[in-house]
Amino acid sequence: MKKILVLLSFFCSYQLVAQECSEYFKLSKGMKIEMVSYDKKDKPTATVKTEVVDMKPVNGGILLVLDSQTFDTKGRLLAKGQASGTCNKGDYVTDIRNISSDMIPKSADIKLNIDGDKMVYPAGMKVGDKLPDAAINITSTLASGMNLININATISNRKVESMETVETPAGKFECLKITYVMDAKMKLLGDRKLVCSEYLAKGVGVVKQDQFDEKGKKQSSMLLTKLEK
């Protein structure tokens, strides 16, 4: 379940966009990004590799197509899939449903269904701005029809908190810090609230993410480790 929440947070926010987007998302076809996820003890748990494989005009904006692969700490492939994001008039929009298909590990006997809103990163973001909320529903069932998982998550109180310097294995970046609250209601597994932060660097996108519980204890994080432009 923790892996699902980490992937959810990642794919909700980390999509790459073209030159027509705002300065924080001015990326290009062929760009490769590697991020490593860590547990609450800062031990590596997985590596996510993403590449911008296509970009094309659509409905007055730009569509970005992304290939992503998730590996465990031994380098074994856990999941792979393709996602997309769009940029229009400087706004970047990612469909939360991008997390569907093969991005969450599952077996052939399990059917996964994801429905949700679009996550918006407006043009000209600055400290003090409030950003639109979003919601997502994840359900999984066995081929027999038996329900396994039902998760309803809301992403609220999104705001641009501050400007901060972030050091990563891929370099040092001046970042816009965005915070939000993720409330996940999970049937049979109980509810969970996470206070999340993400750090956006100009021309790179997200370089760091942190997730904390309601008491302020770190639960997981992700950090940029490699960048190829």
Language-model regions: role of each:
Residues 1-21:
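Bacterial Sec-dependent N-terminal signal peptides
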Residues 68-100, 107:
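Hydrophobic/aromatic-rich structural module bridging two neighboring secondary-structure elements via a short loop
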Residues 28, 96, 100-173:
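Solvent-exposed helix/loop surface patches that form functional interfaces
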Residues 19-82, 140-229:
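Acidic, serine/threonine-rich low-complexity disordered tracts
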